[in-house]
Amino acid sequence: MAKSSLDKKFDKIREREESKSFSTKKRSRIVSKFVNNRLAVFGLIIFSIILLATIFAPLLSPYDPMRVDLRSMRQSPSLDHWFGTDNTGRDVFTRVLFGGRVSIFIGLGSAILSALVGIAVGCYAGYKGGWIDLIALRISEIFMSFPQIILVLLLVSITGQSLFNLMAIFILTGWGGMYRLARARMLSLREEEYVQALRSFGLSTFTICYKHMLPNALSPIMVNITLSTAMFILTEAGLSFLGLGVPLNIPTWGNILNVAQDILVLQNYWWMWGPVGVVISVFVLCVNFIGDGLRDSTDPSQQG
């Protein structure tokens, strides 16, 4: 006897549940492929070292990052001050560690929060379609039609300088890319048979979108978050170098670089800006290595 339509739908759900073991094997292959990527592993190791160094900064340096010591102004690197001191005698190594806390918090926090906004809107709009999708798409197009740095500069001049204002601006200008990524994935998945079966059983839109469909889009989302983290860290550094980012009384990698605006410092006191410039470059490079590793390991065309 031929199966009824209801039985076929049950079969689709059952196949979906049975595929979990396959998904576990697939995740194992992804991890194995990532581990075999030397650049990705190298990036992850250096990323972890820098991150842990910033977290445990008080244990690694006896100095206060904001303490002024006029007797130690502009000292070159030594055993007492590994990266030297700045114009007011503050230890540069300490400021790089504590500044990394803020810069990484801004970059990673903005990337994750903008991703959450983009995912929430993109999944719902892509699944439901209609006027909700149209409005969300047009709003994202408005934000993405401007060069991001110009839009950020404009919004900073309106809202003023503060750490959380800058993060809010990054989220506002950065959610569009993740929205379009999530939306495209939902558009391709919503006609799948298992989604139609779930819909026929009366499951809520939230359950279908975020519990059953979203896990299939996590791979490109993770890659996008890593790349956004690097972009936001570089943007913060550039804005703070210009004096338009985080207030100067808060140590960040960009604020430490700010001293390089002085041609005297640029030419004669390389330790005030050189080490932090290297740290920014290495950290962003490692984040990009991690992103490339995630992309390669999750690319279906390269799966064995």
Regions found by a protein language model. Give the residues of each.
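Gly/Trp-centered helix-boundary motif
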Residues: M1-A115, I119, W131, G245, ...
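Hydrophobic alpha-helical transmembrane segments in multi-pass membrane proteins
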Residues: I45-I46, S103-G118, S145-V156, P215, ...
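Transmembrane alpha-helix boundary and packing residues in multipass membrane permease domains
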Residues: I50, C123, L153-S157, L166, ...
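Short helix-capping/hinge motifs at transmembrane helix termini and TM-loop junctions
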Residues: A57-P65, G126-G130, V156-Q161, T173, ...
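Conserved G/P- and acidic residue-centered "switch" motifs that form tight phosphate/ATP-binding loops
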Residues: G118, G122, G202, P215-A217, ...
